[in-house]
Amino acid sequence: MNSAVPGTTHDDIAALTPARARERFRAGERVATSGWCPGFTQANLIAVPQQYAYDVLLFTQRNPKACPVIDVTDAGSVEPGIAPGADLRTDLPGYRVYEEGRLVAETGDAREHWREDMVAFLIGCSFTFERALLESGVPVRHLTAGTNVPMYRTNRACRPAGRLHGPMVVSMRAVPADQVAAAVQVTSRFPSMHGAPVHVGDPAALGIEDLAWPDYGDAPVLADGDVPVFWACGVTPQAVIAAVGIPYAVSHAPGQMFISDVPEATWALA
């Protein structure tokens, strides 16, 4: 779903502070956040009842490529350390609600779905390193096209943890063949934002049957000479929840991230 304010341009969203962006989402704007507030950290969200929090924490520790945790709330808290004063129930553009592993609701306001004992995990997002890609001369096709990044469930199993198991999800960016090495080099500096790609080239090697039909996000944009490059993705917990049927969870809508106050440089290796 895309309901950006009419007349909003890329320059407008790039100039926003994270706090102002969160205000707009709180007011009901629903949009993919690639290109928003460049220079600041974006994060995936997965929130579960406290009885499942240790399973999720263990899962993220065993699968840091897909689930690099950058913040965890206390049970019942909706204010993350990476954005003091923010409210995780309202300050993302979109949310998904899962019951017994089934998607039961999509909303722009999660307050009525947020239980008192929820523990929220914020997981680094690859949108954070897109500015660095652009600055190095690597095009970001979905950003130019104004679409959401395509994401795919793969045949790569994550390491099980407690009651959790399931497939890795990846995001895909089409990169000119002569710039793949640069894309790998740039993104490897951001291990807390998924780091270097997990695969370059043939989608079938990841069990992806048709690149044109992603499981999440929008259809890919490719130019002549592009190579598909795949990064581990923070939507992985949603695929895991669907696989194991966790009784209850709230997540971000894929591509509609939490924008924090933390500069991207915080996570960049020298």
UniProtKB/Swiss-Prot annotation:
Pfam families: D-Glu_cyclase. Keywords: Lyase. PANTHER family: D-GLUTAMATE CYCLASE, MITOCHONDRIAL (PTHR32022:SF10). Belongs to the D-glutamate cyclase family. InterPro entries: D-Glu_cyclase, Putative_hydro-lyase, UPF0317. Coiled coil: none annotated. Its EC number is 4.2.1.-. It is an enzyme of class 4 (lyase). GO terms for molecular function: lyase activity. HAMAP family: Hydro_lyase. This is Putative hydro-lyase Noca_0093.
